[in-house]
Amino acid sequence: MELILLFFFLMALLVSLSSSSSISDGVFESQTSVSGRNLRHAKKKCEVNFEYMDYKVLTKRCKGPAFPAKECCSAFKEFACPYVSQINDMNSDCAQTMFSYMNIYGNYPTGLFANECRERKDGLVCPLPPLYSHNLNASTADSTPRFISLLISAATAVFALLVLT
């Protein structure tokens, strides 16, 4: 009986921890890469429309010529973290598209965020996403998978309690 409880507890823990909560270091490759030939497979179109985003959180806090690292990185995380799962999807063009529009609206030097914004070896730490964010519309909501994960975790815990009683 204790083994069954341990199994369900571990499953619930694994499901709840499976969501990404950091911006991968790999996304910065699209910001630092120089134009040239690329033999990689075609990437799917990003489901987040970065073209019409409000870039003021970046452009008001991350200004040249100094581009203070603390302000720029903080603003970058505030802007990018709500879309962490889309940006980290290396099969989509989300990171490349986001950095393109950031550079258009902010006129940032190439590699600014890649070179200045380092927290861990695997990237920047994002706070866990809320279950619902007013910044996301229904087609880009990354809260739905998180909600499902939490629902599965809760159901597993309830099932484990029922088995024990």
From Swiss-Prot:
GO biological process, one term: synergid death
Protein's UniProt name: GPI-anchored protein LORELEI
Phenotype of the disrupted gene, per the record: Failure of pollen tube arrest and fertilization. Deficient in pollen tube reception by the female gametophyte.
Signal peptide extent: 1-20
Superkingdom of origin: Eukaryota
Main location: membrane
Keyword list, A-Z: Cell membrane, Fertilization, Glycoprotein, GPI-anchor, Lipoprotein, Membrane, Signal
UniProt subcellular location: Cell membrane
Propiece residues: 140-165
Membrane topology: Lipid-anchor; GPI-anchor
Assembly and binders: Interacts with FER.
Lineage: Eukaryota, Viridiplantae, Streptophyta, Embryophyta, Tracheophyta
GO cellular component, one term: side of membrane
Residues that carry a glycan: 137
Renumbered residue ranges of the record's region Required for its function in pollen tube reception: 82-93
Expressing tissues: Expressed in leaves, buds, flowers and stems. Highest expression in the synergid cells of the female gametophyte.
General function of this protein: Female gametophyte-specific component of the signaling pathway required for fertilization. Required for reception of the pollen tube by the female gametophyte. Acts specifically at the synergid cell surface for pollen tube reception. Plays a role in double fertilization and early seed development. Component of the FER-regulated Rho GTPase signaling complex. Acts as a chaperone and coreceptor for FER. Required for localization of FER to the plasma membrane.
InterPro entries: LORELEI-like
Gene name of the record: LRE
Residue positions bearing lipid (GPI-anchor amidated serine): 139
Protein source organism: Arabidopsis thaliana (Mouse-ear cress)
Classification via PANTHER family: GPI-ANCHORED PROTEIN LLG1-RELATED-RELATED, GPI-ANCHORED PROTEIN LORELEI
